[in-house]
C-alpha cells in the first residue's frame, strides 16, 4: 500500500494513516540509498509545515505517538546525509512531537491511551530527562485498564493482543536501554499475556477465527510468543 503513493509528488498531502503515522519511513529505509533518505527527510519537513498548527487530526488518537516512534527509530537513516541545518530541523520536529505527545498524554482519558502512546511517552520522558518515576503508577493503571484478569487484551482480538504484547516488550527494552528499572506490572503482564496467547493456537499452528482472528496474521502473533527467550539468546 505504501508503495502505491510513496513515489508520488507531494504524497505528504495524502490523507492516509500510512502517511500520517510516518510508516512510510520504514519502507524508505528498506528502499535505502540517497533516494530513500531524501524522500524521507523532505516528506517529514513538508508534512510538518503543512500540519504543525492543526489542533485535531492528524494530531488525534495515537498518530502523534506513532510518528514520534517512527522518527526516533529511523533517526540515523533520516539524518545520514543531512546538513547541519537539516539535522537541526529534524531535531526540532522530533522535539515538537515529544512535547505534543506529553501534552496529549495528560489530556487523554485513561481508556484513550494506547500502547503506542506508552512507548512515545516513555521515550519522551527519558530523552528529555524528566522524572519517569512519577508516571509509573499511572502507566500501571493504563496497562490494567487494557488487560483482563486472565491476561487477555480487552479487545479480545488476537492481533490486538499480539500488538499490545509486542509494545510491552518494546517498553521494557527502552527502560533497560536507559538503565531504568522495569516495573513489576510490565514484567508480569508480559508473562501472563504470553501464556494466554499460547493457549489460542491449534495443534496445526492456526488460530481460531473469531473477533478479528485471521490466519494471515499468524506469523505476527507467533512472533509475539516467548520473544523474551529469543532476545536473551541473541
What kind of region is each of these model predictions?
Residues 1-13:
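Extreme N-terminal leader/anchor segments
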Residues 14-190:
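Aromatic-lined, polymer-binding surfaces characteristic
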Residues 152-234:
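Carbohydrate-active enzyme catalytic cores, enriched for enzymes
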